[in-house]
Amino acid sequence: MPTINQLVRKGRASETTKSKSPALQDCPQRRGVCTRVYTTTPKKPNSALRKVAKVRLTNGFEVISYIGGEGHNLQEHSVVLIRGGRVKDLPGVRYHMVRGSLDTQGVKDRKQARSKYGAKRAKAAK
């Protein structure tokens, strides 16, 4: 334990927090190109085929990104926008695709939480 004098001379070193999405480099989103689009299976209690893509970002990082929503139009060489946010049951997936921007289409026939999936408002039926 330091003495008062030692604290006056040196002070306490503040702890630096480690980023949960280092590839974004403090940016809200990053652009990248899909190098591989595939499905993968989640961790133990869950079972599904989750859609993911390996993306090479403009800053040189290569990351795995989750494609949310039902159905997508992505393939190799698609230009996409990546945001932070991990997928709890997919190890190594720390980023999400932004739907409805660049080459990524929004989710079709989406009625609720549309802004999260890049879906336009449906025309009102008369």
From Swiss-Prot:
Residues 1-26, 101-126 are annotated as: Disordered. Keywords: Methylation, Ribonucleoprotein, Ribosomal protein, RNA-binding, rRNA-binding, tRNA-binding. Residues 113-126 have a biased composition (Basic residues). The modification 3-methylthioaspartic acid is found at residue 89. InterPro entries: NA-bd_OB-fold, Ribosomal_uS12, Ribosomal_uS12_bac. GO terms for cellular component: small ribosomal subunit. One of its GO terms (molecular function) is tRNA binding. Signal peptide: none annotated. PANTHER family: 30S RIBOSOMAL PROTEIN S12 FAMILY MEMBER. Belongs to the universal ribosomal protein uS12 family. Part of the 30S ribosomal subunit. Contacts proteins S8 and S17. May interact with IF1 in the 30S initiation complex. With S4 and S5 plays an important role in translational accuracy. Interacts with and stabilizes bases of the 16S rRNA that are involved in tRNA selection in the A site and with the mRNA backbone. Located at the interface of the 30S and 50S subunits, it traverses the body of the 30S subunit contacting proteins on the other side and probably holding the rRNA structure together. The combined cluster of proteins S8, S12 and S17 appears to hold together the shoulder and platform of the 30S subunit. NCBIfam families: rpsL_bact. This is Small ribosomal subunit protein uS12. It comes from Burkholderia pseudomallei (strain K96243).
